[in-house]
Structure formats: C-alpha cells, structure tokens
Amino acid sequence: MAKRALGLGQKNKEKKRKVDNSNSNNEPNRNSPAPGADQIQVEMDENADLDDELTQLKGLWNNYFHSDRESEYVLNGIIHECDRLLRQSDSDEKTKKLLNDEFYAIYALALSELTIFKTEQEGEDVSQYFDQALEWAEIGMEKTSKDSQLLQLAVSKIILQRIPLQFISKLTVDSKPEDVNLDLFEQLQRAKKCFNVEKDLELAYEVLQMFDDLLDMLENFGHGNNIDEGLDSDEEDEIEPVKLNKKHPLYRLQKAIPENYAWLKETMVKLFENIEETTLRRNVARTLGHLFLKAAEEPTSVFMQQYDDEDEEEETEDKEVPKEIKQAQKEALSHTRTALDYLEKAQVEDEPETWVEVAEAYIDLGNLHDYQSSEQEKAYKVAEDILKKANRASHGRFQDILDNLLAKDQD
C-alpha cells in the first residue's frame, strides 16, 4: 500500500507555516481594522450580493478554507471583521440580523485555525484561542439555534484540532493526569456527538480526516520522531502501540482506538452516501478505501502467519487449515473487496496514481486467496494490466511495483 499522506494534525507538527512579517510577532488589536484588510483579494460568486457584509465575510472565509492555509494575515482579517460586525451590531439592527449561525461558525473556526500559527511562536498559550473558539460557537447556538448543525460541526472540528495541538504535542509516555486540565476521552466523545453529515459536507469531510489523524497519532504515540516524519505502511505493521499506564491522560483514548476506527468507517460511509459533488465524492471514496485496507491489516497478518509457520516447520500434505485462519481470511477478503470498491470509485482519468492504488489493492486481494488458486491468478492479472496501463501513461513511473508483481508470479 502506498505511503499514507500526513493529515492536518501531523502536517501542523512537521511543516513550517509561512507567517506574514507584519503580524508574526504582534497580537492583533481587535478594536481596530486589520492593517491592509481592504487589500485582501476575495473571489465572490457571480450571483453574490457584494454589498452584503456577511456575504463578504463568507467569501473571505471560503478563500482561506480552500487555500493552502499558510496566511495568518487572512485569518487575522477574518477575525477583525467578525469583531467589527459584532461592535456594529450593538447599534445597528440591520447588522444584528446578519449574525446568523454561519457568522458565529466562521468566527469560531477562524480562532481555532489561528492556533496553527500560534503553536510556532515560542511561549504562546493556544488554550485561550480554543477557549474563545468554543465560547463563540456556544454563544452562536444561544443566539441562533441550539440545533444548528453547522455550529455543532464547528465544535467537533475545534475539539479535534485542540486535542493534538494543545495536549498530545506536549505529552510523553510518562505524563501524569495532572498534566492536562481536560478529560481528553470525554472531549473526543463530545466531538463525536456533535458531528453530523447532513450539511456542510466539505467541512464534515475535513473533520473526519482530523479524526483519522488523531487515531493515527494515538496508535503511534511514544514512538518519537516517527510521528513527525510519517510512517510507511510497512513500518506501521511492525510497530506495536506503546502500552500506557492506566492513569495516563491518553490511556482511555488508546484503548478506544478500535471502536473509534469502526465509528470513523461507519460515519465516513454515511458522508459518502450524502455527497453528489464529483471531486469531494472521489476524495471521500479514496479515504474509505484506505480505511478498509487498514481494517484488513490485522486479519491479513493472522492469515499470512500460516506461511511463516510453514517456513519454520516441515510442510505436511493435506494439512488442515485452522478455523481461526479461515475466519481471518474471510474477514480480510471482505474488507479488501470493500476497499477496492471505494478505490475504484476514487479513480481519476488523468491521474495514474489513483489507478495504481486500485492495482495494489488487487495485489492485496490476490495475496489473501489460496496459493495459486484461480482467484489469486485473476486478481494478480487485473493488477498487472492496470499497472502496465499506468506505467505507459506515466513513462515508467510505476515500474518497480510492476516488477515486484511479476516476480511474485514467477515464485
């Protein structure tokens, strides 16, 4: 399986964010307009009301949300504009009516995003930004609707951004309960409870990606620089989770990893079923493919152990396969077939790497079938055909994978 791309939580730790020089060392003054805020370029929908201040704010947020998110300057501009509208609403009824759940969600999410930059500034306490972000989301629910799905989703995102940045990044395997001032397990439960997939599907997908990143961090907690650098899937198979003391702040979260992966898969499937937009649907399908391949790893390991045992012992003819091996094979095949279904839906016509992910899943499928069976040969042949096509389209970029498969066929 190809190397897993680092997600938001890990990118924040390993990637140096670019910070605008004019704002890098100074806390923004919320009682004055953002310096040069009127110079920020904002792309608006052609049907948008350009005189509507909330529409302008939404345009600014969407620009940031769909960018590479490397501008603290833009975030400060969003926060200053939110502050300005709040002050203006005290004396202007028209402005007051603009402050709906979208406004409060933008304010809360912008404050939460700001922590990405603040973690890089020595001595900066990000807890205040997360506290304010949650406070504005809660104020928004009080002012608009407690049932606002957007604000609930914002709360979920803020919590999932907070746990890694404020807490996990500072913890070690020897940390004590008093090292954190929140029950992180209960915080994650709250994030799950607040999550929903009916609206704001792009934001919902990002939240689930952050959930996935968090589980990955918990699995690899205590393995030092491996978390920062990212782990190849082959390396992940060899690394056992560090066993934490029962009083460790992450102990309950670590114990809940399997059930949380199950929740993630189930919830991601619901999200996929609600999406019609092509690009987002493909992205979610690709993530689901990887999640189901991951689910197949443990039963695959159990199934493949029989071949390792045969290398150590003399093979006996007609040796009966243990029941647990057969069950593991069945489970791994089920997960891998489901992964294949999603990865095929994630293919992009002019992106050969998406075809190769399908080919690699077919190789996994072949490995799970009985040795030299017709099912195994068929799976390998499909993988070979896809790899040859991808190799031609990419001028030999995937030759190594193809060579490895052909060598397997000759064994």
UniProtKB/Swiss-Prot annotation:
Give the CC-aspect GO terms.
Answer: nucleus
- This protein's superkingdom? Eukaryota
Low complexity bias (residue ranges): 21-35
Region of interest called Disordered, as start-end residue ranges on this chain? 1-38
Biological process annotations from GO:
positive regulation of SREBP signaling pathway; regulation of translation
Q: Which UniProt keywords apply?
A: Nucleus, Transcription, Transcription regulation, Translation regulation
Q: Give the InterPro entries listed for this entry.
A: Nro1/ETT1 (IPR024318)
Q: What is its main location?
A: nucleus
- Localization: Nucleus
Q: Which family does it belong to?
A: Belongs to the ETT1 family.
Task of the protein: Required for correct translation termination and probably involved in regulation of hypoxic gene expression.
Q: Which PANTHER family match?
A: ENHANCER OF TRANSLATION TERMINATION 1
Protein name per UniProt: Enhancer of translation termination 1
Species of origin: Zygosaccharomyces rouxii (strain ATCC 2623 / CBS 732 / NBRC 1130 / NCYC 568 / NRRL Y-229)
Taxonomic lineage per UniProt? Answer: Eukaryota, Fungi, Dikarya, Ascomycota, Saccharomycotina
